[in-house]
Amino acid sequence: MKTGKELKPGTVIRLENDPWLVQKAEFTKSGRNSAIMKTKLKNLLTGYKTEIVYSADDKLDDVILDRKEATLSFISGDTYTFMDTTDYTMYELNAEDIEAVLPFIEEGMEDVCEAIFFEERLVSVELPTTIVRKVAYTEGSARGDTSGKVMKPAKLSNGTELQVADFIEIDDLIEIDTREGGSYKGRAKK
């Protein structure tokens, strides 16, 4: 059993005997009302999508999923093909199935993902907590600001934009925390 406040993208819960994938989860706590979790769910069997609001204390049935290591093999339009690293089986996912990690997926990446299966069917992937990506474009740094606390926008090679420290330059490798939408962690060790 899970509670409403434990929901996060990639979690699968059972509603009316169907498995539902949590694609988006936003925790909100206001002074007057109790804490709530706004979720965007996708039915893994039918593909139907819906949005449901849960209170933080709601009890939900979670689904036991199989997990395997996989790597991105190639991208064809909106279809992403992943390969199981143990038996080399290929699995396909649509872009909408991996919406939460899509900003950090790029052709040729070498990160080992965690493929999530429900009844032998690939339903989602999770990236490692920390990934390394190359900065494709960023503005020059302001003179004298080397403390690392001043942030500026940067664009990765796949088009994703995020805030990085002011001293980061084009072609620098940076570490990104993939949880909660992704954030800059620091310059990658060479």
UniProtKB/Swiss-Prot annotation:
GO terms for biological process: peptide biosynthetic process. NCBIfam families: PRK00529.1. Its main location: cytoplasm. One of its GO terms (molecular function) is translation elongation factor activity. Pathway: Protein biosynthesis; polypeptide chain elongation. Coiled coil: none annotated. The keyword Protein biosynthesis applies. Keywords: Cytoplasm, Elongation factor, Protein biosynthesis. Involved in peptide bond synthesis. Stimulates efficient translation and peptide-bond synthesis on native or reconstituted 70S ribosomes in vitro. Probably functions indirectly by altering the affinity of the ribosome for aminoacyl-tRNA, thus increasing their reactivity as acceptors for peptidyl transferase. This is Elongation factor P. It comes from the Bacteria. It is found in: Cytoplasm. The keyword Lyase does not apply. It comes from Pseudomonas fluorescens (strain SBW25). One of its GO terms (cellular component) is cytoplasm. Belongs to the elongation factor P family.
